[in-house]
Amino acid sequence: MPIGRALAAGTLALLAAPALALEPPVNAGAAFLEAFEAACVPQRQSFEGTKANAVAEGWVAVGDDHHPELAALLEKSRAEMTDPDYPEWHGILAPYAQDIDGRPPYLIVLHFIAPGTANYIGCYLYDFDALDVIDPQLVTAFTGNPIARQSDQDGVKSYLWGPPPGLPGTGDVYLAHIADDSTTVAITGFSGLAIKFDTYEPGSGKGD
């Protein structure tokens, strides 16, 4: 089981398609990206630190049943993190909610523990009600990298940027929007907007 397939599985699948030129998005999304940066960047190398930082930024811990798409996403993610070939590998998911500019996004912080290889902390922000992807140039400015891959197929717009040079240990940054009628919803458990990155945990292997 490859590391990172848990919450990333659906998004990675979106980015496997050939690169296509995309039209400018309707939603500029600065507030969404700012919320992601504020919650995910400062303590990204620590699971407990990221959770504490999220609370300091106004996020409130919620249960799986806070939103049906959150419940479906978490259920699928937990299933992806269970593999009989790697019984010691496991993940801990911490979901949070907050109102941002009148919208109800959800933050998920992941601690994936993989003895024998490397642990990582994932930070994922979702807006299940978003109608379009945010302006990808905002993410280009955030990462300091050009878009490495993009696609627009089956109601899914997706983008990938390489590891941000200013964030040591952090991997690729993914951005995607999934339309309500996309067949990808059956894979991900949700429609709407998502942005994410994973950071290797210091002292656990790769990324030390």
Language-model segments: residues:
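Bacterial N-terminal signal peptides that target proteins for export
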Residues: 1-10
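Primarily N-terminal secretory
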Residues: 12-14
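N-terminal signal peptide c-region/cleavage motif recognized by signal peptidases
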Residues: 16-18
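Terminal, regulation- and interaction-focused segments at domain boundaries
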Residues: 22-52, 112-136
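Accessory recognition modules or surfaces
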Residues: 22-33, 65-101, 105-107
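Short secondary-structure junctions
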Residues: 55-70, 75-85, 140-155
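Long, charged/polar, surface-exposed segments that mediate recognition or autoinhibition
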Residues: 87-161
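Glycine-rich, aromatic-bearing surface loops/beta-hairpins
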Residues: 139, 145-208
